[in-house]
Amino acid sequence: MKHLQKKNSKNPKKIEEKYNTRNSYFILYDRALVWLTLGLFSVGLIMVISTSIPISQKIYHNPLFFIKREIFYFFLIFLLSFIFLRTPIIFWEKNSNIILIISIVLLVLVLLIGHSIHGSFRWINIGFLHIQPSEICKISSFCYLASYLSRKSNEVRNNFWGFFKPMSVIITQSMLLLAEPDLGTVVVLFFTTISVLFLSGAKIGQFFIIITVSILTIILLILLEPYRIKRVLSFWNPWEDPFGNGYQLTQSLIALGRGNFLGQGLGNSIQKLDYLPDAHSDFIFSIIGEELGYIGSFLILLIIFTISFRAMYIGQKALEKKQIFSGFLACSIGIWLSFQTSINVGSVTGILPTKGLTLPFISYGGSSLIINSIAIFFLLRIDFETRLKTSQAFPRGPK
């Protein structure tokens, strides 16, 4: 009996220790980031449901076509979370070169066997899945850049060739992306890479050369392609040709104008009824403005930029703990998400020419949604490892 009592008396302590361990691991995850992301996912799903029914019925004679695919993507993201949240960041640092090579191979393959939509070869079809290599290219580039800076940060600061090496990788990817063509992703890659190199302490003179060459290249690319010239001219004054090159932008502006401050109400958009092209993907923000108004649009942008600033904060904390790869990866994710959001919103409001970029976490698109989710998993894992390192630095005293 005494033996049984002793055995049973130890069990509660073991159970308590197990509970405390699991609970502490949960606390070590950034719960604010989790809830913000889940909130955006919910808004994105609701808006895809609202915007995709008309076009699903018209093209596929099934009003739930895009909705079913979106739900499948969320289920896939849920499964991927078990892998990425449990994988140490050091794994991605060690294999960053392999991931980069895979993404470049995919960029080559999409030009050879890719599926064309609106004249752009951006998708590889594998069964019912449509893989967009340009989305994979973003996260692979930032993993490579962070890995390079963790090894060669002094070389980047003191040597032009150390600065130019990561830029040469981006240039190689950009040439393949422009062949699709996908100028929007090229702009995002260049801006994010230059911003992260600036954070690493690279000299201003090095940026001057790269930025000058980049601007001249973009101008040349616009002048060489007639459709890009038309895009720039239609963005400059879309009302000059409202039923031609300026059609999409004028319909987008009409949607935003109809929304006013409070919006027409969820599901009450008129522009999504086959007036505004890509209402469920690149131009979903216009329908958000129409249905939820300026206030709803502002709140959604506030959440996205809060996530971006949170990423920068996580990166700063990691760098303070000498976790160089983690720090630069988190910073690159924050810059990428905020810059891509700015370009998307600028395009649908007529501030910038259209670039074919999605609104992160909101627009329909499996590759975009999955890659954005993986970026969040990276942030959560980086924050987890940083907090774990901090907690281990302060050992508990004897009980």
From Swiss-Prot:
Molecular-function annotations in GO: lipid-linked peptidoglycan transporter activity; peptidoglycan glycosyltransferase activity
InterPro entries referenced in this protein's UniProt entry, alphabetically: Cell_cycle_FtsW-rel_CS (IPR018365), FtsW (IPR013437), FtsW/RodA (IPR001182)
Secretion signal span: none
Gene Ontology biological process terms in this record: cell wall organization; FtsZ-dependent cytokinesis; peptidoglycan biosynthetic process; regulation of cell shape
Matches recorded under HAMAP family: PGT_FtsW_proteobact
Known role: Peptidoglycan polymerase that is essential for cell division.
Family in the record: Belongs to the SEDS family. FtsW subfamily.
Protein name: Probable peptidoglycan glycosyltransferase FtsW
Gene: ftsW
